[in-house]
Structures are given as C-alpha cells and as structure tokens.
C-alpha cells in the first residue's frame, strides 16, 4: 500500500512539476459529420466543430496537459459559441493578421483538428488550400502543398511539432505524407467533393479522444518537418468564385494567374510579417 501511494504521488508530482500546453488549431471541413458546402455555412458545421473540439480538449487534459489553447481557425475565426466550449480551454477567435498560431507560448504540441485535403485532391470532401474562392493550387519549393503541409512548416518555425491531424481519410494520408510519424485520426471517408461516409458522433469522438492521448504522449518523439530556405511559395490564382467543380471533382484551370514569393520564413510568405 505504501509503495502504491508513493507511485501515485510520483505521478502527480510529474504532472504538476512539468506543466505543458497543447494548441488546437480547429478548422471545420474535416469535422465529424461535415460532408458538403451547405453544412459549413450554417449552424450545423459549427456545432460539429464544437463537439470535436471538446472531445479533443478533454483528452488533452486527461493526457496531462495543464493548458489547452483552441484557435477557431475556420473562415472568419468566429464560428463556435464560446459558451459551448470546455471552460478549461482558452479560446482565440477572430482574425490574427501575420500570426498563424497566436499565444503559442508554453505549448509543446499542436493539433490540427477538422482539417481537409489540399485543393484539386480527387474526390476529397471540401478540398481547398486556404481559399476555396480563388486559389487553385499552392506549391512550396515546387512541391504541391495544402494547409496541412504549410501549417506544419510554420509550426516548425515556432519550434513546436504538429503531433495529430484530425480529418477525413484523404487529409490523414496527406498529413502522413508531409509529417512522418504524425498521429492521424480519421473522422470520415470521402466519396466525392460533396459527400462522405461518416462515423457516428459517439464513435468519432471516442476515436478523437484516444488518438489525442496517443499523440500527446508521443509529443517529444514526433519530428518536426524542416523547411528548406530560401523557400518559394507559388500560388495559382483564378478569378474569384471560379474555382470549378464538375461533380464529383475539381477541374484545373489551365491558365491561372501566378503569384510567387521567396524568403526565409514560410509564415511571412503566407500571411505577412511573422511574430518576433
């Protein structure tokens, strides 16, 4: 009995002596049950986003985190109702110009929740790269990239690894391709750009919780992907609103407008001046 008490006290000491935070960057398209454009423009998608966030937040704390920051990262950044989010979490809403991961200090792991595949991925649910209105494709040093790859590179620039990516099957494959060793959590399987086969909410949230705990436990062993500098970010732009979808796939415009930026900071190439 005395030995057991000492073990428990030791575990409690370890949890409190080495506090750490987890940063959850939440998008909507990859969340549980979201399969089409109509669902992300109203309350349905926001409610599903809240539920996935809460499953992830609770698991972070159960895994030993002493702080969890949630960034509402879909569109305007004003999607979830703060009253519906686990009160233990810190919630960031609204636009944060020039900074992808606001208030990352003290966090040892980043989770990309509700993410989707890059634009032009065949038959991938709601696939796009930052803008579904006018961005046809993006490349970093010649390699086609989406939000998962770029956000992982920016995370490296801040010294924090992406440990978990949560989304549809194609987003999970993309994450594994970009971040060797990353934990992935599949919430659904894409059928077309506007349809998918989903897990029940109960099963999906249980999977999110299990995968979150696994990823947080592995946070020191998942390597950060290393940017190659100078980096060139190439973006293929088409007229606003003309990213074409011929059901069930996206169709590439053969004559896009090209924008290129080169520099030694991926975050600055994407959104402007990086955090000092």
Identify the residue ranges that each predicted region occupies.
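Short catalytic helix/loop segments, enriched in acidic residues and glycine
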Residues: 40-56
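Active-site rim beta-loop-alpha module in soluble metabolic enzymes
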Residues: 154-162, 166-211
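Positively charged n-region of N-terminal signal peptides that target proteins for export
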Residues: 1-4
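Boundary at the C-terminal end of the N-terminal hydrophobic targeting segment
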Residues: 17-19
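A glycine-rich helix N-cap at a beta->alpha junction
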Residues: 86-103
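N-terminal signal peptide c-region/cleavage motif recognized by signal peptidases
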Residues: 12-15
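Active-site glycine-rich loop that binds ribose-phosphate moieties when present
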Residues: 132-158, 167
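C-terminal accessory domains and tails appended to enzymatic cores
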Residues: 204-276
């Amino acid at each position: 009995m005395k030995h057991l008490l000492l073990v428990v006290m030791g575990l409690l000491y370890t949890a409190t002596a080495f506090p750490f935070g987890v940063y959850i960057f939440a998008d909507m398209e990859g969340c549980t049950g979201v399969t089409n454009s109509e669902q992300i423009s109203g309350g349905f998608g926001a409610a599903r986003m809240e539920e996935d966030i809460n499953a992830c937040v609770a698991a972070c704390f159960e895994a030993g985190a002493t702080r969890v920051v949630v960034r509402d990262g879909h569109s305007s950044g004003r999607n979830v109702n703060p009253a519906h989010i686990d009160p233990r979490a810190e919630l960031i809403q609204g636009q944060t110009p020039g900074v992808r991961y606001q208030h990352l200090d003290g966090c040892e792991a980043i989770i990309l929740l509700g993410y989707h595949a890059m634009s032009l991925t065949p038959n991938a649910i709601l696939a796009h790269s930052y803008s579904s209105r006018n961005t046809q494709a993006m490349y970093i040093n010649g390699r086609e990239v989406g939000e998962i790859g770029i956000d992982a590179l920016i995370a490296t620039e801040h010294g924090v690894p992406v440990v978990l990516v949560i989304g549809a099957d194609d987003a999970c494959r993309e994450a594994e391709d970009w971040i060797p060793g990353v934990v992935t959590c599949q919430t659904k399987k894409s059928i077309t750009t506007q349809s998918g086969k989903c897990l029940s909410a109960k099963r999906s949230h249980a999977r999110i919780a299990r995968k979150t705990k696994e990823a947080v436990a592995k946070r020191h062993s998942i390597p950060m992907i290393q940017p190659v500098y100078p980096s060139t970010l190439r973006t293929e732009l088409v007229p606003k609103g003309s990213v074409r979808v011929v059901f069930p796939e996206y169709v590439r415009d053969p004559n896009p407008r090209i924008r290129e930026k080169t520099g030694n900071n991926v975050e600055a190439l994407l959104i402007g001046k990086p955090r000092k």
